[in-house]
A protein has these predicted regions:
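Glycine-rich loop(s) and the adjacent beta-strand/alpha-helix scaffold that form part
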Residues: 40, 56-57, 66, 70-77, ...
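Generic, well-ordered alpha-helical scaffold segments in large soluble proteins
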Residues: 2, 53, 57, 104, ...
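Generic recognition of stable, solvent-exposed alpha-helical segments in well-folded globular domains
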Residues: 29, 33, 45-49, 63, ...
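A glycine-rich dinucleotide-binding beta-alpha-beta segment and adjacent secondary-structure elements
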Residues: 8-10, 31, 69-72, 82, ...
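Conserved redox-cofactor binding core of oxidoreductases
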Residues: 1-68
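FAD cofactor-binding and catalytic pocket of flavoenzymes
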Residues: 130-255, 262
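Structural recognition of the beta-strand scaffold that forms the well-ordered cores
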Residues: 9, 103-104, 240
């Protein structure tokens, strides 16, 4: 029925064979420590990958408790030459100079730093000649889809802690007959299947021996599809600095002014509709 829809294993930023000797990274150990930053270094994070590699060179100095709030711009040489920081413990300010500066503070803090980096050349923030800095916020909109139960496979179970579920790549608005007139762009699904467990009985609908027997047996199979859709770049979806509301270090706080608009709301309707339809056509119940 769905010639243009493909369910595959999800992809993660994992290495498959480890790294050079001495860097201390290995492939996934299936230990369910992903949310701790992966102590095995199997997936990329600065804590387990680039920082240890930089430290191993002997040329890295790591300064903690340092809040970067401005990039220093040299108007004579027309280049960034360093950063200004506040020590979060002493409240003292320092300047650090460098030939090359990498802004790696993630999306919102990096934008905030650039907006605070004002000079005669960049009165509205470093690199903000267009006035677009802080505008066009884009992220996934999600938490919509469908789930269902399945009768059968009662003699089957699963083992291990695979760090990912299934994925259905985007299939709307990719050419040909996939064009949807209700919205632009598209979405994909993340999902997975599992069997219910003892948490199903936390409402205490039963008790005694009946409850004991119920909680030690795997429950029914369930499957969920969770949509992750694109947000269009709207100029009015923005963040800005509030200099009237500062944090404990006297820096302006970041205020968000953004919302989902008609295109995203129409897409969400389709995300739910298609998920329900696929599960129903696959023989699931209680969709």
């Amino acid at each position: 029925k769905y010639s243009n829809r493909h369910m595959t294993i999800g992809r993660v930023a994992h290495i498959t064979e480890g790294t050079k000797p001495g860097l201390g990274r290995s492939n996934c150990q299936f230990r369910n420590r992903c949310r701790r930053g992966c102590p095995f270094g199997a997936y990329f994070s600065s804590n387990s990958s680039t920082l240890p590699a930089a430290e191993a060179t002997g040329n890295m100095t790591l300064r903690t408790n340092s809040i970067v709030y401005e990039v220093i711009y040299d108007e004579l040489n027309k280049r960034a030459t360093g950063v200004k920081i506040i020590d979060s413990e002493s409240n003292l300010t320092y300047e650090f100079k460098a030939k090359i500066i990498f802004m790696c503070a993630s999306t919102v803090p990096t934008t905030s730093i650039l907006m605070q980096s004002k000079s005669n050349r960049f009165p509205n923030g470093l690199g903000n000649d267009s006035g677009e800095l802080g505008h066009n916020i884009m992220d996934h909109h999600f938490q919509i889809g469908a789930d269902a139960t399945y009768d059968g496979f009662e003699d089957k179970y699963y083992t291990g802690r695979r760090p990912n579920g299934i994925y259905i790549p985007r299939f709307q608005n990719i050419g040909g007959k996939t064009k949807n007139t209700n919205f632009l762009r598209g979405y994909g699904y993340q999902g997975g299947a599992s069997r219910t467990d003892w948490t199903k009985y936390v409402k205490e609908a039963s008790y005694g021996e009946k409850l004991k027997q119920a909680v030690i047996r795997p429950g029914e199979w369930t499957m969920g599809l969770n949509g992750f859709g694109e947000v269009l770049p709207y100029h009015d979806n923005k963040i800005f600095l509030d200099y009237n509301k500062t944090d404990k270090w006297g820096l302006p706080t970041v205020t968000f002014d953004a919302k989902l608009r008609e295109n995203e709301l129409n897409m969400r309707k389709d995300m739910q509709l298609q998920a329900m339809e696929m599960l129903d056509n696959a023989g699931f119940k209680n969709v």
